[in-house]
Structure formats: structure tokens, C-alpha cells
């Protein structure tokens, strides 16, 4: 019988870029770190800047899981190898949940979640919509099978709006709303036309991440987030040697 690895994990995805995936990922990593969970981080796709932020938070490397340049077996092996001995893993998605290569879902956040058996925490910005949010979330949850979205997090949201939207979204979508984060302009991780600034260009990054994690401890059900992470399917327990073997597409 093949050895399996139980690695609690979740993938932070969103309907589109600019929803706050990196902010939420970094805040979760710090919050889990405070709880002594020894977290590790991964990035969907080849992007190198987001992993720099993960490393800045954790003090250890974040790894890329790219289903275009490597196959599904190697992605699972890399996740298993790097996650061995860790208490929880946070995978940061790319663009919108289903945005992959050439207008398909190939190598998308959803593709990686499906391949690795990782539940998705969907980050949603609720500005300018109410019930329509439920229609959007429901569409995302059902767009491809299997549906990998296991919970929602409202980002850039006031307490009053969160109290209004949470029961409605849960009733209409059947998905738990695991919390909310308010707009914290002084904690924003700035971006530019070619993407995020690098960590060295963000003044006071450690303090910003600390404040975001403290806010998350107040307004996000971290036990619920961990329960979602613990629902992840077991992984093949690949050793480090196997994780380095595989075909790459260049």
C-alpha cells in the first residue's frame, strides 16, 4: 500500500486579480505561525514575487507549483516533499480561480486545487453588490467539477456589511463565510502596472503583516479555516529524491 501524507492545506483563490490573495495569504501565514503550526507556503504558477513575500513572512522558502512547466504527479510530489513535517500549508492562487493557459482552466488555481486535493478559500471583495455576490460565488463553485471551493472570506468589508452579507451568502450558496477583513489602507501591499512591489520596496512590511494577522484573529474564524485545511485529501508521501524527477515543458 502506498504511503500517504496528511498535510492540512488550503488554496487562497479569488474571482480576479486585485482581490487581495497575497494580503490574505501573508496574514494567514503569520496567524498560523503565531499558533505554533509551523506553516509552509506555495505559489500556483511561475510568479517569483509572491513567494518572496511568503519567505519574508515565514523566514523559509516558498515553492512554485506550476502545472504548465511540470506535470500533475510532480506537483503532488513537490507539495508532499516540501510539506512533510509542517503543520499546515497555504497555497496562493493566480489571477481568477479558473484562469489558466490559453483561455482554459489548465494550470489555473482550480486545476492545482483539483490535482492536489486542496480545498479553496475564496477571497471576495463585496463592494457594489449584495445578492449578486451569491450568484457569482455560486457560479464559481459550480463552474467545473469537482467543485473545490470550501469557504469564503470577505475582504475590504465593513463589520456592518459583513453582518448583512454573511447569512445571505451562506443561505444562497451553502458555503461557510469564515470571516472578513476591513479595508486597512496603511497595511496595503502596493502594486504597480507590472504587478506587486517586491518586499524590499514595501516600507514596514513586517509591521503591516503583523497588523493584518492581528485583525484576522479578531474577525476571521481561524478554527474554521483550519478545519477547511484539515479536510484536504491525503497526498502521496513522496521523498525528496522523487520530487526532483519529472518532465518539464519549456
Briefly describe each language-model feature range:
Residues 130-244:
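Internal gly/pro-rich beta-alpha loop/helix module
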Residues 248-250:
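Conserved small/polar residues in nucleotide/adenosyl-binding loops
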